[in-house]
Amino acid sequence: MLAIIQVGHNDASDRYIRNKVKAVMQAGMTAEVINLPETCTTLDVLDAITLAGRSSECRAIMVQLPLPDHINKEAVLRSIPEHMDIDGLNPRSDLMPLTPCAIMRWLKEQHIRLPGKNVTILGRSELVGKPLANLMIEAGATVTVLNSLTEEWFRRNACYSADIIVSAVGKWGAVFRDYVNNGKKMVVIDVGINRDNDGKLCGDVSHLARELVERNGGICTPVPGGVGKWTVRELVIRLAEMEGRHGTNIVPE
């Protein structure tokens, strides 16, 4: 069983959790969502993790991020038993976070080779940016990681010259038209989940940038239905491994 601990509610997290539970159940396994109020304390979250870890049925624990500001995220993640840390977020865990692994699996399935490629990653989080950069460097790519302090001229040039852009900023329009090289087929991996000016679910990539990438014959991953979907699939694969299951029927479509 997978235990998912959620503090409070927001649209993106609620949607993501529903997709996780559905995929796990479709694969013949079980998941339980433990909802805690937004007003709970760090100690309340730690207690929930301890109780889940003591369950004889529980094989994996994940804490849905982001957590409210008053919760000590570092203490929470460190408290997840390493052998149950399916998300790989405990600093002592040997596992990589799910999303970078899912992106690497997708690149392999699409036959997109990394050796010699120039990759620009927007965002340096512990959840996506940093671990993905390490995986891509190990695979032979030249990787540039940008953050909120990166000057705009450098950001634009790094994206324009890239073969692959990964945006994990969490801001619609973080990648706009001027970042796209009109003369090459680029791969743009959109990790963000946001709302545009019309309230429609979208990623970090602006509509004009997405259109230009696709018009040039490149790939711009969809939101929804892209990275989030791959991450859920990676979750199911990892849960099956933790439960000692084998077979192709564990992988959701």
What are these regions (language model features)?
Residues 57-58, 162:
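Short, high-confidence coil segments that cap the C-terminus of an alpha-helix
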Residues 73-87, 183, 189-250:
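Rossmann-fold NAD(P)-binding glycine/threonine-rich loop
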